[in-house]
Design a protein with these regions (language model features):
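Penicillin-recognizing serine hydrolase domain
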Residues: 2-27, 124-275
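Active-site-adjacent loops and short helices of periplasmic peptidoglycan-processing enzymes
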Residues: 2-162, 166-175
Length: 275
């Protein structure tokens, strides 16, 4: 398989560091991107709900096929009623650039922004979802299946931690993606249907970026994507670097509580300087 050349591959030979407590997380993966080594693997091929980690796939397609300066117009489908769904406040008729929509998608996890991007790229959410599944397969992510561009709970919408690594590994090839996920805050101005200005004010949902959780000494967290729903639990995919600047991707799916998510991810990435 041509995928294996520059990718981490799951083998039976991974001996997990027993000092790392991942008891509260269903699936955990740590990959060394330089040596293409899997350093920690727990249930990384189990199919689980990704929640908003889905938005990484949405971002890849936007960056691959879209133009950052293009102006997007929101349809009535940006009005999402589901309780607890994170929204940045986009209303039907609002216009913003693709760059602004990507910031809303990745920093504040805006589900409304996800719909706006999907309709801009493909004309409809359903057609965009077909593209998500096609593109995922092209990345070798063969054990995941998407039903929407945002990750709100839906039957037959799932990923594996390993597929999430493959998808995130593709996303970080885009400079704009890295710039956005590393941002704690973003402000911009977009416009409503009448052309009146609206403020876009975003704050990172990632506690390693927004300062709500400390980062291990000798480790730099570049950024990542959070995901939280009752079905998915607490999820996080992260790009970090060790004290030599070598990059790592770490994934946790279905952690029981947000505090445990960051504690277990902290323990996981703290080990990168020991290898």
């Amino acid at each position: 398989s041509f995928f294996a050349e520059d990718l981490c591959v799951i083998t039976d030979s991974v001996s997990n560091n027993t000092m790392i407590d991942t008891s509260q997380s269903e699936a955990v993966l740590l990959c060394d991107l330089n040596d293409h080594q899997v350093l920690y693997n727990k249930n990384s091929t189990e199919q689980l709900n990704p929640a908003s980690l889905t938005k990484v796939m949405t971002a890849i397609i936007a960056l691959k096929y879209g133009n950052l300066d293009d102006m997007l117009t929101a349809s009535s489908n940006v009005t999402i009623q589901e309780s607890g769904a994170s929204l940045v406040g986009i209303s039907p008729g609002d216009t913003m650039t693709l760059s602004q929509a990507l910031h809303a998608l990745l920093i504040a996890s805006g589900n409304d922004a996800a719909v706006m991007i999907a309709e801009y790229i493909s004309g409809s959410v359903d057609q965009f979802v077909e593209l998500m599944n096609t593109e995922a397969l092209e990345l070798g992510a063969t054990n995941c299946h998407f039903m929407n561009p945002h990750g709100l709970t839906q039957d037959a919408h799932y990923v594996t931690a390993y597929d999430m690594y493959l998808i995130f590994n593709e996303a970080i090839k885009y400079d704009e993606f890295i710039q956005i996920i590393s941002s704690n805050e973003y402000t911009g101005v977009y416009h409503d249907a009448q052309g009146e200005p609206k403020e876009l004010s975003l704050k990172s949902t990632n506690n390693f970026i927004n300062g709500n959780h400390s980062v291990p000494g000798g480790v730099v967290v570049i950024g990542g994507k959070t995901g939280t729903t009752s079905a998915a639990g607490n999820c996080l995919v992260l790009l970090s670097k060790d004290s030599y600047g070598n990059p790592y991707i770490s994934v946790i799916l279905k952690c029981t509580q947000r505090d445990y998510l960051y504690d277990e991810m902290y323990d996981l990435i703290a080990t990168v300087n020991q290898s």
